[in-house]
Amino acid sequence: MATINQLVRKPRKRKAKTSDVRALEACPQRRGVCTRVYTTTPKKPNSALRKVCRVRLTNGFEVSSYIGGEGHNLQEHSVVLIRGGRVKDLPGVRYHTVRGALDTSGVNDRKRGRSKYGTKRPK
């Protein structure tokens, strides 16, 4: 325990909080190229085949990114936009691909919550 005199001379330092999405480097989104597109299984107690892609970002980071929505058109060398946002039941997946941006198509036949899936308004 520090004495009051020691604290007067040198106050306590605040611990700096590190970001959960460090690869974005304080940007809202980042562009990258898919290096691998695959499915993976979630943690217990959930069961599914979650669509994930490994992305090499323009700043040199390589991260795993979740592909939301039903069906996608991504393959290796697709250019994608990623945003922050982890997937709780997939360890190590801390980013989401933005649907409807760059090479990623929007979700077909989506009627509600379209803005989150890059779908145009149906006629």
UniProtKB/Swiss-Prot annotation:
Sequence ranges of Basic residues compositional bias: 111-123
Keyword Flavoprotein: no
Pfam families: Ribosom_S12_S23
Residue stretches in coiled coil: none
UniProt entry keywords in alphabetical sequence: Methylation, Ribonucleoprotein, Ribosomal protein, RNA-binding, rRNA-binding, tRNA-binding
GO BP, sorted A to Z: translation
Positions where 3-methylthioaspartic acid occurs in the chain: 89
Region (Disordered): 1-22, 101-123
Source organism superkingdom: Bacteria
Gene Ontology MF term list: rRNA binding; structural constituent of ribosome; tRNA binding
Entry-linked HAMAP family: Ribosomal_uS12_B
Function: With S4 and S5 plays an important role in translational accuracy. Interacts with and stabilizes bases of the 16S rRNA that are involved in tRNA selection in the A site and with the mRNA backbone. Located at the interface of the 30S and 50S subunits, it traverses the body of the 30S subunit contacting proteins on the other side and probably holding the rRNA structure together. The combined cluster of proteins S8, S12 and S17 appears to hold together the shoulder and platform of the 30S subunit.
Subunit structure: Part of the 30S ribosomal subunit. Contacts proteins S8 and S17. May interact with IF1 in the 30S initiation complex.
Protein name in UniProt: Small ribosomal subunit protein uS12
Protein's organism: Teredinibacter turnerae (strain ATCC 39867 / T7901)
